[in-house]
A protein has these predicted regions:
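Membrane-targeting alpha-helical segments
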Residues: 1-4
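Glycine/threonine-rich ATP-lid/beta-loop region of ATP-binding domains
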Residues: 9-12
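Terminal membrane-proximal soluble interaction domains of membrane-associated proteins
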Residues: 16-107
Length: 107
């Protein structure tokens, strides 16, 4: 159990300090979900991690078209805090973010 907790803590520290990981919003049906943009793939696709509240390091990896992902101008610490606090405080952190849905979303 100690190794598992230690490994999760080390992973969290790596993600918080990783310059290549970008907080983002992912278009899901009629709304947005906070995500971590991990890397570009071929043909306009990207790899994202969708964290599950309230644990910022638990969730799912998804491969999506890049036009469904909107990078955010916030830090990883801020993005992880949104997840940890189950969205409370999002209004301040996401102030000024473009929340218009992509064309065809939710259709």
């Amino acid at each position: 159990q100690y190794q598992l907790v230690k490994s999760m803590g080390e992973g969290l520290a790596r993600v918080e300090s990783a310059e290549s990981v970008q907080p983002a919003l992912v278009s899901i049906e009629d709304g947005w979900q906070i995500a971590y943009l991990l890397e570009p793939l071929e043909n306009g696709w990207v790899t994202v991690f969708l964290p599950q509240a309230p644990t910022p390091m638990s969730g799912n990896v998804m491969y999506l078209p890049a036009d469904r992902v909107r990078p955010l101008d916030i830090t990883m610490v801020q993005a992880m805090a949104i997840v940890k606090h189950i969205g409370v405080g999002s209004a301040e952190t996401l102030r000024g973010a473009d929340l218009r849905l992509p064309a065809g979303a939710g259709a």
